[in-house]
Amino acid sequence: AACAVAERSLPEREVHAAIHDGLLVLLDSLATEDWPTVYIKWELGLLKEIGYGLDLSECAATGAKDDLVWVSPRTGRAVSRAAGEAYRDKLLTLPAFLLTPGGVGGEEEIAAGLKLTGYFLERNLFAPHGASLPAARQRLGERLRAISAV
């Protein structure tokens, strides 16, 4: 899935050392149970590297740095529980592990993380070119969501 996303989102012959290094970390993590967390963080890094990074540092509405639980699909910025409660149905879930250095996601958080990165990859990279997420990435999301539903 990572190779398919990288191939479809990065210009050919353009060097992106951070993406390459992150991919090596991801490949090393495949032998561990935490690889889905590493994968989601890799996708966040890819978005940042190509100019579509999410701002998860503070609430877009209030500037608060605590209790960040959603991301605005319009701005890609974090939203606190207090500021976003009235709009919760329109916001994307922000998995807590993305806010904690070294944090690892549980099954539901992994599903939410894949939905979050998938949304921004689709909207910013693929849809403008009449494309969708690569099939391998779609299958990865479906399989991990199925595991979290069990």
Task: Name each model-derived stretch.
Residues 1-150:
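Non-catalytic alpha-helical scaffolds and adjoining flexible linkers that form interface surfaces
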